[in-house]
Amino acid sequence: MFDTSVFIYALGGEHPYRAPCRAIMSKGVEGLLAGEASIELIHEFAHVRARRGVDRRTAVADARHIADTSRLHTVERADVERALELWSEHEQLDMRDAIFAAQALNRQINVILSPDRGFDGIEGLQRIDPADDDAVASLIAA
């Protein structure tokens, strides 16, 4: 499961995560990395891009590209219920990330690709840092 930050860093300005996140996006486009994402990721991505001054046409084109190269999951009631539980149990987790974690867990997806340490410590969910080349390579090989 992708976290929004992978795409924000990949398409954003200079940052230590920019190159690893761009490489991940390339692997997704090439079909080497099966990308799972929440429909909420598209919303968050477009909102953040527009808020950072990217014109809407570009933000829409970028969001469509992500949607086209990811398997999108809608938010179901069970996801909301589980997200609320996760959010109450993990103080470091914000609510949108709790939704992403719940969606992953409810779909037996046990990995989230994210630099955000807020996902650490969630039972049944392993966070893989985009800058961890070996861990990312293991996803491609899987």
Predicted regions mapped to residue ranges:
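Short, well-structured N-terminal submotif of metal-dependent ribonuclease cores
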Residues: 1-37, 51-58, 134-141
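Alpha-helix capping/helix-boundary segments
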Residues: 6, 41, 79, 99-100, ...
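Short, flexible helix/strand-to-coil boundary loops that buttress conserved ligand/catalytic motifs
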Residues: 11, 49, 123-126
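Active-site-proximal, substrate-binding regions of enzyme catalytic domains
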Residues: 22, 44-71
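Acidic, PIN/NYN-like endoribonuclease modules and their adjacent C-terminal/linker elements
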Residues: 101-102, 106-142
